[in-house]
Amino acid sequence: MSVLRGVRVLVVENDDMNAMLLDLQLVQAGAVVVGPVGEVRDALQLIAADAPDIAVLDYRLGNGETSEPVARLLSERGIPFVLATGVAIGSIPSGFERGVILIKPYLSEELVGALSKARESRGAEG
C-alpha cells in the first residue's frame, strides 16, 4: 500500500502507543511522518517551520489541551487534516469542521481512505 508515497503527514497524538501505531500505518502507506508530537505548542512550531501536506490529529491531548488550535492553523493555511478521535461526533467543536472525522478504533485502510478524502476535498476547494 503506497497510496501516500512521499506525502508529509503531521501526527498530533499524545498517547505513545497510538502514535507508534499511527506512525507504522502511515509509513506502510508510503507517507513521510512529521512528528509525532503530543502538544499543541510543538505541532504549531512544526507547521510554522516546515508545513506538512496533511495532518492527523487526536482531539484530546495531554494536560487538558485539545488539538483545536492546530486544526484552526491548518485550515487557515489550506492544509487538510483528519481528526482521529474516540469522541462522539456531536461533541466535536466547530473548529474541526474542515477536517475529515475518523472514529477510533479504525483500520489502516480506513485511515488511508480518510487521508485521501481530506486531500481530495481540499483540492476541490482550492
Stretches found by the model and what they are:
Residues 94-102:
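As written
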Residues 16-35:
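Two-component/phosphorelay signaling modules centered on CheY-like receiver
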Residues 48-50, 73-78, 90:
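Conserved phosphotransfer cores of two-component systems
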